[in-house]
Each structure stands twice: as C-alpha cells, then as structure tokens.
Amino acid sequence: MKKRSAALAVVIVLMSHHIAAADLPVHEVQVLAGKFAFDPPTIQVMTGEPVRLVIRSKDTVHGFSIPKLKIEVRIPKGGDPVIAEFVAPSPGRFEIACSEFCGSGHGQMKAALISVAPVTTNR
C-alpha cells in the first residue's frame, strides 16, 4: 500500500507540474542548423516554462539532440521545420549536439541550452 501511495504522490506532483506549465505562455525559439553550427549557439529558457524549438537546416540533414532532456529530432535538408517541445525540469546547462553525421566538422557541432530558475520576489 505504501508503494502505491508513493507512486500516486509522484504522479500527482508530475501532473500538477505539467498543468502549471500548460498555464504559462510558450517560449518559442527559432534554431538554424548548418555549416557545423547551431544558431543561436546558446538558448536560454526559464525552468518550468513550456519551450517550443522550431529547428531548420540550411544545408544538409542534421540531428538535434539534448541527451539529458531526452530530446532527439532529425532535421531534414531543405528548410522544412521540425518542432521540439519540452519543459526544462531544473536549472542548469544542457549540451546540444548534432546527432546525424553531417561532414568533417560534425563533432564540433554543439550548442548549449541554459535553464535558469524563475526569479521570485518576497513581498
């Protein structure tokens, strides 16, 4: 019974976090992949806010991966957008990498997602 109660408590906490995030406006960021770089090279978001990345390639097929957030999308060549939506669960720096071999500079195709805690005021 204790395990079931603990599991239910976890589900309720996760659901309340999801519902709270759903009430916030979506932070949309346009990301361009090409020539062994992501633009912008650093993306800053608020912890707990819904984020929508609209990712396009300006040259060949790329991947967009944030392993710690379990985000993995394939970006086709031709400029068609791919959407990645998520909520950063905690403050921190998360590495972004190209996960599709795209040429000699593939290993250096990295960027960063910075999640910052919301500022709270005590009045």
Annotate each language-model stretch with its function.
Residues 30-58:
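N-terminal targeting signals for Sec/Tat export/insertion, comprising classic cleavable signal peptides
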Residues 48-49, 88-94:
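Short tyrosine-centred short linear motifs in exposed loops/low-complexity segments
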Residues 1-5:
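Positively charged n-region of N-terminal signal peptides that target proteins for export
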Residues 6-17:
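Bacterial N-terminal signal peptides
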Residues 41-43, 70-75, 85:
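Beta-strand-rich interaction surfaces with strong enrichment in secreted/lumenal proteins
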